[in-house]
């Protein structure tokens, strides 16, 4: 089974968490694209979706799924999204696709976070994947210096502007042994919009695409 086939297995398995008549929180990325395709097969059974990115919104609309604004929804039953890394405590690094802030907002209003990944994303310690930080442009240099003080090696993600009009710093060479503490420290830096650590709001369910098919941990 290829990596993409494992992603597809995880994405389609997430359909079991979608309630009839509900509005579904939808994340961003290659694994989520498979979930969106799966969602298209039951579009008449759901009310619609709240999307975490422009890219996902476009894909949902192409399939005829109504997309609601986050401000118009009080809560969501389920949010389905991928991760760049996930540890045994279901804490994650997200934001490889630069949608981390909107992903965090949609996760915050959701009762259940279903994380869909292939089996290359599971790690013992977070940090091998560069940690994305969304930053207001005028604060880029200051935030980079502060991230160095925390032991990281930040790199400006050239040519990327987030859906919110901000920039991304990717922090390399971090071993994040206490993700909740690191999330708080980075979020406390002036000019940081948010960091791609999902530790305080981790996953409730993890669906992993493996060569044998989808493995579900609740």
Curated annotation (Swiss-Prot):
EC number(s) from the headed UniProt entry: 5.3.1.6
Superkingdom, taxonomy of origin: Bacteria
Catalytic-site annotation from UniProt: 103
Catalysis performed (reactions): aldehydo-D-ribose 5-phosphate = D-ribulose 5-phosphate
Pathways involved: Carbohydrate degradation; pentose phosphate pathway; D-ribose 5-phosphate from D-ribulose 5-phosphate (non-oxidative stage): step 1/1
One GO term describing the cellular component: cytosol
UniProt record similarity statement: Belongs to the ribose 5-phosphate isomerase family.
PANTHER family in the record: RIBOSE-5-PHOSPHATE ISOMERASE
Subunit structure: Homodimer.
This protein's name: Ribose-5-phosphate isomerase A
Organism listed in the record: Vibrio parahaemolyticus serotype O3:K6 (strain RIMD 2210633)
Upper taxonomic lineage: Bacteria, Pseudomonadati, Pseudomonadota, Gammaproteobacteria, Vibrionales
């Amino acid at each position: 089974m290829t990596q993409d086939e494992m992603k597809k297995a995880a994405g389609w398995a997430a359909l079991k968490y979608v309630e009839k008549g509900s509005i579904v929180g939808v994340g961003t990325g290659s694994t989520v694209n498979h979930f969106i395709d799966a969602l298209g097969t039951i579009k008449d059974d759901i009310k619609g979706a709240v999307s975490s990115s422009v890219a996902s919104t476009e894909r949902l609309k192409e399939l005829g799924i109504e997309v609601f604004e986050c401000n118009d929804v009080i809560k969501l039953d389920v949010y389905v999204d991928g991760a760049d890394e996930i540890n045994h405590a279901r804490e994650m690094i997200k934001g490889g696709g630069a949608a981390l802030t909107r992903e965090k907002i949609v996760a915050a209003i959701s009762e259940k976070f279903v994380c869909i990944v292939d089996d290359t994303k599971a790690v013992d310690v977070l940090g091998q994947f560069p940690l994305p930080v969304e930053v207001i442009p005028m604060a880029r240099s200051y935030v980079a210096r502060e991230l160095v003080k925390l032991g990281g090696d930040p790199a400006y993600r050239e040519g990327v502007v987030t859906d919110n009009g901000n920039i991304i710093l990717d922090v390399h060479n971090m071993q994040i042994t206490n993700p909740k503490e690191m999330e708080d420290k980075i979020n406390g830096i002036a000019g940081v919009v948010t960091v791609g650590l999902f530790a305080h709001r981790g996953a409730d369910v993890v669906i992993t695409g493996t060569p044998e098919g989808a493995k579900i941990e609740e």
